[in-house]
Curated annotation (Swiss-Prot):
Presence of the UniProt keyword DNA repair in the record: no
Family: Belongs to the short-chain dehydrogenases/reductases (SDR) family.
Positions contributing to NAD(+) binding: T7, A8, G9, S10, K11, G12, L13, G14
Biological source species: Bacillus subtilis (strain 168)
Tagged with keyword Oxidoreductase: yes
Source superkingdom: Bacteria
Lineage, opening ranks: Bacteria, Bacillati, Bacillota, Bacilli, Bacillales
Keywords: Oxidoreductase
Name recorded for this polypeptide: Putative oxidoreductase YtkK
Length: 255
């Protein structure tokens, strides 16, 4: 049985990925930070999967927690086939670089880039022994080309660095049957993070995307599930955008 480790997998986009992988028969270790209610809701939604589901509390900005999460996954299920780096802090306040505090800057880098480095270091040796692995990171529209993103300098810098790291790992680990790809969700907000595509289509015309509907957690989960398949090994080192045609990073740009 293939096993997935997903950070922040109990709610939002992560929950939809967790549910999709469970539906495919995989076992999943779900990391969460502190929301026990979200864990309870996910357990209630998947009563027949509890023998394939493990929850591990931890803060992805802390190296010791990341190592403990990876160890828990390996100890319980004996392998880690898929590493889904879903967690990543984000500052919603819109402000320019000069207005960031040091803590905010380093928090963005630690949570969105260094955390992934530590998980890579822990999980890649396991995948090498298996001669199989699928690594997924998250980015934003245009991350592969290092665009400027007004009022999102710290987050943008971390994710652009992560795009390069993802592509590098794809090259370095290809000989071991390991692929690495970045998925870039569009403007998926609120309850749409846990929504289905069908639910989004019921709201066609109410969204500002060119396709007429919002992106959903299911959109992202379907892409990730495909990338995790054994026969998806030809797809590696890619940055895949799922935006519905919306120009996400420039929609609020005025200067």
């Amino acid at each position: 049985m293939r096993h997935a480790l997903i950070t922040a997998g109990s709610k939002g986009l992560g929950r939809k990925v967790t549910e999709t992988l469970l539906a495919k028969g995989y076992s999943v270790t779900v990391n969460y930070r502190q929301d026990e209610e979200a864990v309870s809701r996910l357990k209630e939604a998947c009563p027949d999967c509890l023998d394939r589901l493990q929850f591990v509390k931890g803060d992805v900005t802390k190296k010791e927690d990341l190592l403990r999460i990876a160890e828990a996954a390996l100890n319980r299920f004996g392998r880690i086939d898929f590493l889904i780096n879903n967690a990543g802090p984000y500052i919603f306040e819109r402000k320019k670089l000069a207005d960031y505090t040091d803590d905010e800057w380093y928090g963005m880098l630690e949570g969105n880039l260094s955390a992934v480095f530590h998980l890579f270091k822990a999980v890649i040796p396991i995948m090498r022994k298996q001669q199989f692995g699928r690594i997924i990171t998250y980015g934003f529209q245009g991350a592969a080309h290092a665009p400027g993103w007004l009022h999102r300098s710290a987050f943008g810098a971390a994710k652009v660095g992560l795009a390069s790291l993802t592509k590098t790992i794809a090259i370095e680990e290809a000989e071991f049957g390991i692929t690495a790809n970045m998925v870039c969700p569009g403007d998926i907000v609120g309850d749409m993070k846990e929504a289905s595509i069908e639910e989004a289509r019921m709201r066609i015309g109410k969204e500002k995307t060119p396709i007429g509907r919002s992106g959903t957690g299911e959109d992202i989960a379907r892409i990730i599930a495909f990338l995790c398949e054994e026969n998806s090994d030809l797809v590696t080192g890619t940055v895949i955008e799922a935006t519905g045609g919306l120009n996400v990073i420039n929609k609020n740009q005025t200067t």
